[in-house]
Each structure stands twice: as structure tokens, then as C-alpha cells.
From Swiss-Prot:
Function: ATP-dependent carboxylate-amine ligase which exhibits weak glutamate--cysteine ligase activity.
Gene from which this protein is expressed: ybdK
Subunit structure: Homodimer.
Coiled-coil ranges from the UniProt annotation: none
UniProt-listed GO biological process terms: modified amino acid biosynthetic process
Domain of life according to the entry: Bacteria
Protein source organism: Salmonella typhi
GO molecular function: ATP binding; glutamate-cysteine ligase activity
Reaction equations catalysed: L-cysteine + L-glutamate + ATP = gamma-L-glutamyl-L-cysteine + ADP + phosphate + H(+)
Name of protein: Putative glutamate--cysteine ligase 2
Length: 372
């Protein structure tokens, strides 16, 4: 199958997708009523899109093309308002978090959508298990070769993005001992983790053609890589973040990725090579397991350094770019988060340690998303 040409887009523009949990009080399990909410809110939208995801307990908020994080905030806030209003009218809750802490995957209903039904046929129960919730950030690129360079550059910081956004310590009623357990769900997929090595857009087109020989890949959307190019949009899409508990944190993560993209494409600090990925999965695991307390290993020198320290270094490196893009408030907020030493997974564990229940935790998450 041939790949679409890379659509030229304005560099560093943003598009954000948030996969939200649809909750059924008073038990606070996942609901199967996302279709009801989507039908209710679609006529009220003035920007962005609200749509189905894999199962009926998921709802996706997607912005249009945004110039900066202020536009991202405006679009997401407007969508949040209409979703919360409709959820209240239908006696449902909405919340973030990368996993629901006690839902059972066997109960999840796959959406009546041709693509998702085909995916269910290919992957079986793995698709129901993929009822997990992430934030995806698209960054605009001028051409396909820039997109491949940007993908490789951003891959250096996948552990940092995971650690900052980690919000999935509980799954199936248990503490997983991971800060981000969500990404483990995809480990059985044949296209999990980093994209196979290519050095330019022409090589990527050849890779996609070969992947399509499997008959499991009809479009870029069928690939579950941590970061993937999206030629139809003219973007690179970062897919490793858990959905945050607050809109503010989602906006901060978008600002970081935008600023990092600007720094990478203007400074070109790396010369990508295949060896860069030799320890990729080990460093990714450290971020998933331990969050900001994880330890990164340099593939070339063997040096080991705390992920928190390296994240502060990243934030310093991208600060000038953030100022140019109007994203410096996001960098400042994330720097404060790292210095305080926490992420949302840590907050969740503290809630339980203080005597809270998993049901109470989901209730609290719904209140946080509603701004209560």
C-alpha cells in the first residue's frame, strides 16, 4: 500500500488529543455510554472534535490546529465545558488518568466502528485490554525529512515525557508498582515501542509499504509506535503520555513538546543513528516503573543519571524556544513539578495511603476534572 504524501503544515503548530474516562457514579466504574455523550455534545462544539475511541467507556477530545498553547487551552476548555454539562445531564462523570484503577477489561464493549471492529478481529482481547487513556500531541513539520529528524530527536526524551505525565499506578484493582502501567498494555502488540529505524522520508515510505504486506496495516492510524509521523496532518505525533488529571497539566505537556520540537529543529543537537535506540526500551522501562526517580543509561558512555536531573536539563535547554513560542509558563510549571519531586501517580498513591479507596480515588478524579 502506498503512503500519502507528507502534507506541508506550519512548523510547531499543535494538535492535542485527550482520551477521557466516562464514569458511572455512584460505583465509579467505567460506563459504556460514550455514544450518548458524543451525540449530546457534537451540536454544541464551536472548535475541535469529540469522538469515539476504542471502547464505549472512552471519549476523545481533539483540538483543531493551534498556533500556541493559549489556543490549545481555549479549545480544550470549551470542549471540557460542554462535555461536563452533558455528563451532568446524563448522570455520568468524566476524568483523566492513564488507567481506570479497578475496571475489568472483559466488560468493555468495542465501539461499533469499522476500523475498531477490524482491529478487534486482528488483536482479539488485546483491544479490550487497551481501554487505557493517553494524551497525544501533534507538532507541525514543513516536510517529511524534518518529520523523521524530529521523531528521532524526540525519542531521546520519551522517558522524560513518560515520567512527567505518569498517572496510571493502579490497574484491575491492584497497585502495579509502576508509575505508568498504561504503556505495558501495548507490549504484546507487534508494533509496540519505537518506530523501526529509517533515516529519511523516502525510507519511511518503503518501511510503510513493507508493513502493509502484513494486511494488518491499512493506515498510519494502525501503528502503535511511541512516536509516529502523520503525513495526512503534516505532523509528528507523540503518544507516550498518560491523560493528565487536569487540563493545565495537559497544556503544560503540549508546551514542553512544542518547545522541544523547536529546539531540535533549529539547533539540530543530535545526528540520529540507529545505535541511539539500543537502550531505548531499558530507559523507557525506568520511566514507566519509577517515574522521575528512574535512572537513564547513556548508550555511548555508560553514564547513569537520575531522570529528574536530566529532565531539568531538558527544561533548561528548551526554555529559549519556549519563550519564542509563548510556552514559557508550561516550562516553569513543569520545572516546579520536578523540583517538588512528584507526578500524578505519586499523588494517587498518597491518596490511598491516607485511607482512601479506589472508588474514592475515581470520585476525586472526577471532581478534579470538573474543577471542584
Amino acid at each position: 500500500m502506498a503512503l500519502n504524501d507528507f502534507h506541508v503544515s506550519e512548523p510547531y503548530t499543535l494538535g492535542i488529543e485527550l482520551e477521557m474516562q466516562v464514569i458511572n457514579p455512584p460505583g465509579y466504574d467505567l460506563s459504556q455510554d460514550s455514544s450518548t455523550l458524543i451525540d449530546a455534545v457534537k451540536p454544541q462544539l464551536t472548535a475541535g472534535e469529540i469522538k469515539h475511541d476504542i471502547t464505549e467507556s472512552m471519549l476523545e477530545m481533539a483540538t483543531g490546529v493551534c498556533r500556541d498553547i493559549d489556543q490549545v487551552a481555549a479549545q480544550l476548555s470549551a470542549m471540557q465545558h460542554v462535555i461536563l454539562q452533558a455528563a451532568s445531564e446524563h448522570h455520568l462523570g468524566i476524568c483523566g488518568g492513564g488507567t481506570h484503577p479497578f475496571q475489568k477489561w472483559q466488560r468493555q464493549e468495542v465501539c461499533d466502528n469499522e476500523r475498531y471492529q477490524r482491529t478487534l478481529e486482528n488483536f482479539g482481547y488485546l483491544i479490550q485490554q487497551a481501554t487505557v487513556f493517553g494524551q497525544h500531541v501533534h507538532v507541525g513539520c514543513a516536510n517529511g525529512d524534518d518529520a523523521i529528524y524530529l521523531l528521532h530527536g524526540l525519542s531521546h526524551f520519551v522517558p522524560h515525557f513518560i515520567a512527567l505525565s505518569a498517572a496510571s499506578p493502579y490497574m484491575q484493582g491492584s497497585d502495579t508498582r509502576f508509575a505508568c502501567a498504561r504503556l505495558n498494555i501495548f507490549s504484546a502488540f507487534p508494533d509496540n515501542g519505537p518506530m523501526p529505524w529509517v533515516s529519511n522520508w523516502q525510507e519511511f515510505a518503503g518501511l510503510f509499504r513493507r508493513l502493509s504486506y502484513t494486511t494488518m496495516i491499512d493506515s498510519i492510524k494502525d501503528l502503535h509506535w511511541d512516536i509516529r509521523p502523520s503525513p495526512a496532518f503534516g505532523t509528528v505525533e507523540v503518544r507516550v503520555m498518560d491523560t493528565p488529571l487536569t487540563l493545565d497539566h495537559a497544556i503544560n505537556m503540549a508546551g514542553l513538546i512544542q518547545a522541544t520540537a523547536h529546539w531540535l529543529l533549529t539547533e539540530r543537537p543530535f545526528k540520529p543513528q540507529e545505535q541511539d535506540y539500543l537502550l531505548y526500551k531499558f530507559n523507557r522501562f525506568q520511566a514507566c516503573r519509577y517515574g522521575l526517580e528512574g535512572v537513564l543509561t547513556d548508550v555511548y558512555t555508560g553514564d547513569r543519571r537520575r531522570l529528574a536531573d536530566d529532565t531539568l536539563r531538558l527544561l533548561d535547554n528548551v526554555t529559549p524556544s519556549a519563550r519564542k513560542l509563548g510556552a514559557d509558563s508550561a516550562i516553569d510549571a513543569l520545572r516546579l513539578q520536578v523540583k517538588k519531586g512528584g507526578n500524578e501517580a505519586q499523588y494517587m498513591r498518597e491518596f490511598i495511603a491516607d485511607g482512601g479507596s479506589l472508588i474514592g480515588l475515581v470520585q476525586k478524579h472526577c471532581e478534579i476534572w470538573a474543577g471542584q
